[in-house]
Amino acid sequence: MTMDSGADNQQSGDAAVTEAESQQMTVQAQPQIATLAQVSMPAAHATSSAPTVTLVQLPNGQTVQVHGVIQAAQPSVIQSPQVQTVQISTIAESEDSQESVDSVTDSQKRREILSRRPSYRKILNDLSSDAPGVPRIEEEKSEEETSAPAITTVTVPTPIYQTSSGQYIAITQGGAIQLANNGTDGVQGLQTLTMTNAAATQPGTTILQYAQTTDGQQILVPSNQVVVQAASGDVQTYQIRTAPTSTIAPGVVMASSPALPTQPAEEAARKREVRLMKNREAARECRRKKKEYVKCLENRVAVLENQNKTLIEELKALKDLYCHKSD
């Protein structure tokens, strides 16, 4: 029975080997089992689902068919998270680098603060040691207190202008104008004229300002002119002109005294113009009404002349009729 089954297995194995390409391998086993065996694996019938059939030939010529237990490696569905590992390592490296940069920056700031503190304390101690009664500063103030800007009050000097006649004109910040002759010392006891400030306008326009004299009278002057009232009561106006830098030093202005009408004269001139305008309109209306009246009279005269002619003709006709009846 054993020999018959072995012959059948050998015939089927030879048929399988002839149908497909086989791979032979030599396996050396223990001396009590077998010394040399040929293993043939059919590659055509091997699939992932069916077990592999292996033909083992013993040294005595007997062939045995053995079902393989080891299956071929199948491709795995689960992939290894290599990309995630790389990302995690990169993030860890960036965090480490950021921490290292922050630590280096903190150390540099701390080093700068430590290097600056002794210098500030030394300077403050040196300054406080010179003045008696000023305590030494041992603790440094916070950066907000030290960084507060100091407010310094600066007094702007009053500009003083000198005219060609030797008279000094001082213009204060409030808009007041002070005048002084050449013989007075300094600018004390000057005559003051108060002028209102004018807003900035377009070039070429004339700005009028009210100037108040010492007696309380207000006059209207342009913004580029200065009114001067002498001790005798005479009022003079000076026009300030900016001289070119090539002919005169900066800060000195030229003054001239053009004739400027006062406010009452301007008011009288304005009233006179209004009165003349009204008179012209009234004369024009009177001439128009006169022409209309004359034309109406001429029409009436023409009507009366026609009526007179008609009456004369009727009178002649009545006379002729009366003469015939009398005959």
Curated annotation (Swiss-Prot):
Pfam families: bZIP_1, pKID. Residues 270-295 are annotated as: Basic motif. Keywords: Activator, Biological rhythms, Differentiation, DNA-binding, Isopeptide bond, Nucleus, Phosphoprotein, Transcription, Transcription regulation, Ubl conjugation. The keyword Metal-binding does not apply. Residues 8-146 form the KID domain. CDD domains: bZIP_CREB1. Residues 269-327 form the bZIP domain. Phosphorylation of Ser-119 allows CREBBP binding. Stimulated by phosphorylation. Phosphorylation of both Ser-128 and Ser-119 in the SCN regulates the activity of CREB and participate in circadian rhythm generation. Phosphorylated upon calcium influx by CaMK4 and CaMK2 on Ser-119. CaMK4 is much more potent than CaMK2 in activating CREB. Phosphorylated by CaMK2 on Ser-128. Phosphorylation of Ser-128 blocks CREB-mediated transcription even when Ser-119 is phosphorylated. Phosphorylated by CaMK1. The keyword Ubl conjugation applies. Residues 20-29 have a biased composition (Polar residues). Interacts with PPRC1. Binds DNA as a dimer. This dimer is stabilized by magnesium ions. Interacts, through the bZIP domain, with the coactivators CRTC1/TORC1, CRTC2/TORC2 and CRTC3/TORC3. When phosphorylated on Ser-119, binds CREBBP. Interacts with CREBL2; regulates CREB1 phosphorylation, stability and transcriptional activity. Interacts (phosphorylated form) with TOX3. Interacts with ARRB1. Binds to HIPK2. Interacts with SGK1. Interacts with TSSK4; this interaction facilitates phosphorylation on Ser-119. Forms a complex with KMT2A and CREBBP. Belongs to the bZIP family. Phosphorylation-dependent transcription factor that stimulates transcription upon binding to the DNA cAMP response element (CRE), a sequence present in many viral and cellular promoters. Transcription activation is enhanced by the TORC coactivators which act independently of Ser-119 phosphorylation. Involved in different cellular processes including the synchronization of circadian rhythmicity and the differentiation of adipose cells. Regulates the expression of apoptotic and inflammatory response factors in cardiomyocytes in response to ERFE-mediated activation of AKT signaling. This is Cyclic AMP-responsive element-binding protein 1. It comes from Rattus norvegicus (Rat).
